Regions:
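Soluble, non-membrane globular domain cores that form compact, hydrophobic packing
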Residues: 1-131
Length: 131
């Protein structure tokens, strides 16, 4: 069974951006706690269960950049949860821009969702290095 990644979602999110310079980061990047009220904005459905989740998005509407960490509940079916996310996320949720790179993957009970452009490979690489 795959090891779960320990630590707060905020700390993990910070690690995902390691090695990316300030200039490369989207403007006005902020972390938003995901709740049952706002989850649809980030994962495309409110019909989803999770322990906790955190999004990192630009507050500028024309920047296609959304990184979401979802921690599954104890004993939850990770593959089913990933499938729900894959079927519902919307890389076109920004009015005039589209995220070209979409990634949904997990390590243990932690799911990473990337909808982004050139930063996607670096963020995914950082996720793969987490332990």
């Amino acid at each position: 069974k795959e090891q779960n990644i320990e630590g707060s979602l905020e700390d993990i999110m910070t690690k995902l951006y390691e090695g990316i310079s300030e200039e490369e980061l989207p403007m006005a990047l902020s972390n938003i706690e995901i709740t049952s009220e706002n989850v649809e904005n980030y994962l495309g459905t409110s019909d989803i269960e999770f322990e906790s989740a955190l999004a990192s998005e630009s507050m500028v509407g024309s920047i296609a950049h959304s990184i979401v960490l979802v921690r599954a509940k104890e004993g939850q079916d990770i593959e089913a949860l990933k499938k729900t996310i894959e079927e519902n996320i919307n890389p076109n949720k920004w009015i005039c821009v589209t995220a070209e790179n979409v990634v949904v993957k997990n390590k243990g009970n932690l799911i990473l969702v990337i909808m982004a452009n050139e930063l996607a490979p670096k963020i995914e690489e950082n996720f793969d290095k987490l332990s």
